[in-house]
Amino acid sequence: MLAEDSYLIRIGRLSYLVAYLEWAVLGDLPHIPGLPPDLGVRKLAGMTTGRLGQTLQSKKILQQVADVDTQDWLRRSGELLEITARDRNSVLHARPATVDGKQMLYRWHPEGNQVFAVDEAWLEAAEQRIRDAIRELSVRRVATF
């Protein structure tokens, strides 16, 4: 038995927001002067959300960027992508379960100290975190078009 359509739509919306945040970062990179070749979109596009976040924050990369505002934007982009990756992974690595009589995803990863229902409240909070990240990066944008 599947979860209700409204719940499944929220899962889809969360997935879309993750992709939107990733592209908000990747799409700006070609328009930021002075970036090293390792930050080429072709090199980064296949990375997971978490790996992309780690790459953008790496000292090796940041040391190659002269502009302080660009360094800050890259670092913060990486941090926000890593936070988003945790939410993304909580959904994608969850399993269907019946909780309080409703079908929903249940994140069960005891070694990672992640055991919880991916319920409406959790989805709302995760969506809000990602929306806030998108807004923050938009305000701090360093790309020139």
Describe every region a protein language model picked out.
Residues M1-D5, Q64-T70, E111:
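Short, charged/polar, low-complexity loop and linker segments
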Residues T70-Q71, A126:
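Generic alpha-helix initiation/capping and coil-helix boundary signal
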Residues K102-A117:
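Short secondary-structure subsegments characteristic of cysteine-rich extracellular domains
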Residues W122:
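Short Fe-S-cluster ligation motifs
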